[in-house]
């Protein structure tokens, strides 16, 4: 089997994780207590969904997941929620005091007390796998736990499981909406380690997802639950080919191979279509061509940046439901003729497609309509750099005055780490610039030494 272990860190990671596991259970017909009436082979490990669930002798299905937070309130919601019987109590790890939005607390003082316990639990999960293929890491980089403990865990995973791929689902700070003043610091410090220790990072941003909920689902005041259910559809589409059988299956390592041209350029945009409410879906015929087009709409992107300002390097389309390869090829051919969707000149083909026959599931009482087919797009576009330059700008404004820095230094960080991380991000912005540049400038000479 090719198992995946999910690691959910901090409030964002845990709440997105809740939405994901709820959706996985619905898609596989697993009840909240872990029983699966449709599964005839008790304890048999060869079903496709066993990549994400392990089976006990009693026929209970347990998620291969760890939830970690430095304070108990968010994890207590899992411990008392509808799916409390699904998770093994050892998989829910919570500390006593939180990271207080401080990267240094999550990474150095408080985080290092809990990280060995987490690694121990992850080790137990991985011993339970026959062929672990990688980790899915869910966190946000604006807070303290997601950024600090998240980076610490990723660094330790690189040491313990060097060759295994790590896929990150990372919530980045939004341009207008902010949950804490020191978001720019935490984001820059933690992106510094994401650059080194994740193989593919999929950027999400609350504001972009708010706008999608408002525009496409007519929810006037979206809550985190609305956002997370939308995010979980994307993640479910990505992992569908690991959990079900399909025509063109895609492995976690395949994302990496097809989307990452250079090791540092691994921050992806994602979009999902159709995002449509039940009353509208009734009146629309959502053909493959239509959903493919809307996946490329700038307004469908789940991070606030405009792909028309950059060029695509590669793009991965994961279809699910009633889709045949012929329609996909036709839709992709149409996309290629569009002038607004530009690819870099050194990557002429640029599309990887996957098809999965399992139609998208929906949470009962959720906002999304039940549809016959859906597509999720993960793309590597140079426009992602907008996300970083925005954060860098805010970082510079604060750091010029050394505002709030004493909180970090007081927890055992050195000021040098700020400038080191900031330089790394400046280099990343430069990398994106060079990748998007045309080849005729003869720039490729100096890139040869770098990689």
Swiss-Prot record:
Reaction equations catalysed: GTP + H2O = GDP + phosphate + H(+)
Chief location bin: cytoplasm
Active site: 254
Matches recorded under CDD domains: alpha_tubulin (cd02186)
Residues bearing the modification N6-acetyllysine: 40
Single annotated GO MF: metal ion binding
Cofactor(s), names only, from the UniProt record: Mg(2+)
Binding site for Mg(2+): 71
Primary role: Tubulin is the major constituent of microtubules, a cylinder consisting of laterally associated linear protofilaments composed of alpha- and beta-tubulin heterodimers. Microtubules grow by the addition of GTP-tubulin dimers to the microtubule end, where a stabilizing cap forms. Below the cap, tubulin dimers are in GDP-bound state, owing to GTPase activity of alpha-tubulin.
Protein name according to UniProt: Tubulin alpha-2 chain
Gene source species: Hordeum vulgare
Encoding gene (name): TUBA2
């Amino acid at each position: 089997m090719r198992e995946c272990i999910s690691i959910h860190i901090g409030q964002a990671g845990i709440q997105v994780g809740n939405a994901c596991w709820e959706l996985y259970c619905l898609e596989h017909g697993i009840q909240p207590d872990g029983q699966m009436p449709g599964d005839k082979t008790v304890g048999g490990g060869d079903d496709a969904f066993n990549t994400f669930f392990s089976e006990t002798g009693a026929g209970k299905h347990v998620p291969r997941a760890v939830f970690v937070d430095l304070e108990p309130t968010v994890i207590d919601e899992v411990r008392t929620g509808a799916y409390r019987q699904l998770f093994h109590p050892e998989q829910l790890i919570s500390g006593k005091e939180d990271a207080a939005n401080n990267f240094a607390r999550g990474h150095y003082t408080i985080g290092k007390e809990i990280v060995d316990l987490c690694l121990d639990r992850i080790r137990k999960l991985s011993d339970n796998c026959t062929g672990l293929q990688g980790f899915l890491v869910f966190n946000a980089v604006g807070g303290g736990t997601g950024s600090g403990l998240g980076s610490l865990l990723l660094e330790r995973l690189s040491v313990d499981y060097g060759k295994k791929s790590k896929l990150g689902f990372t919530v980045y700070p939004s341009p207008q909406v902010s949950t804490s003043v020191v978001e720019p610091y935490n984001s820059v410090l933690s992106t510094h380690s994401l650059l080194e220790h994740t193989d593919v990072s999929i950027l999400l941003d609350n504001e972009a997802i708010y706008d999608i909920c408002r525009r496409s689902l007519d929810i006037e005041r979206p809550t985190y639950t609305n956002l997370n259910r939308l995010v979980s559809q994307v993640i479910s589409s990505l992992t569908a080919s690991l959990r079900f059988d399909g025509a063109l299956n895609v492995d976690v390592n395949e994302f990496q191979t097809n989307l990452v041209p250079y090791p540092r350029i691994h921050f992806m945009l994602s979009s999902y279509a159709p995002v449509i409410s039940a009353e509208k879906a009734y009146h629309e015929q959502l053909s493959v061509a239509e959903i493919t087009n809307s996946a490329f709409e700038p307004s469908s992107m789940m991070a606030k940046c405009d792909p028309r300002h950059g060029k695509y390097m590669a793009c991965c389309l994961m279809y699910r439901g009633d889709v045949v390869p012929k329609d996909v090829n036709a839709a992709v051919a149409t996309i290629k003729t569009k002038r607004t969707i530009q690819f870099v000149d050194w990557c002429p083909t640029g599309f990887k497609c996957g098809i999965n026959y399992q139609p998208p599931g929906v949470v009962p009482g959720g906002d999304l309509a039940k549809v016959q087919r859906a597509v999720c797009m993960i793309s590597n576009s140079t426009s992602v750099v907008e996300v970083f330059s925005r954060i860098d700008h805010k970082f510079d404004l604060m750091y010029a005055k050394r505002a709030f820095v004493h909180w970090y230094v007081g927890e055992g960080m050195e000021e040098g780490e700020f400038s080191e991380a900031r330089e790394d991000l400046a280099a990343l912005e430069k990398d994106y610039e060079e990748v998007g540049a045309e080849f005729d400038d003869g720039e490729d000479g100096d890139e040869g030494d770098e990689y």
